[in-house]
Structures are given as structure tokens and as C-alpha cells.
């Protein structure tokens, strides 16, 4: 059974395994640098450890592969019969991280 962990980042919880690529909310880290996630909620494998609320001393290390933006989401509001309309777009920034190690 492979080791996995559940980490908290960007207001979300993400299940990760070594070698997996994950997309998280934008982190202020350059591409190619390592990033450490200290908020580990659960470490699973041969023996599962559940934190209360976090697992003490557990970290997950990954490498930032790239920074980018998601596809554009377009919102359009209008008032019928008034000739009033508003169009707005948004592209959410993200960071792609490849998980290197889970230290429990």
C-alpha cells in the first residue's frame, strides 16, 4: 500500500501521493523551487495517522512545476427591455506542484 497524505492549502484539502502532480491556489514561489506543506491533516499507508487537527511533525515536500491561469470564466448580467448589460471575465491563477516526499 502506497503512502498518501491529506494536506491543507489554499483553503482546501487535497489528497496527495509521491510523484503526483496537483493544482493548487497560487503560491508565491518561483517555478523550479521546492515548497513545503506543513498543514498535514492525515498520513495513510501501512499505519494511518489522523491529526487532531494536524499531524505533529509531518510535512509534504513538492517542487513547483509552473504557474499559470485557468480558462476564462465569463459572467454576463442584463436587464430585460432596458438596454443595460454587463460582461465580465475572470481567470483564476494556479500553481502546479509535483509531490516529492511525504515525511511523517
Swiss-Prot record:
This protein binds to 23S rRNA in the presence of protein L20. It comes from the Bacteria. It comes from Streptococcus gordonii (strain Challis / ATCC 35105 / BCRC 15272 / CH1 / DL1 / V288). GO terms for cellular component: cytoplasm; ribonucleoprotein complex; ribosome. GO terms for biological process: translation. This is Large ribosomal subunit protein bL21. Coiled coil: none annotated. InterPro entries: bL21-like, bL21-like_sf, Ribosomal_bL21, Ribosomal_bL21_CS.
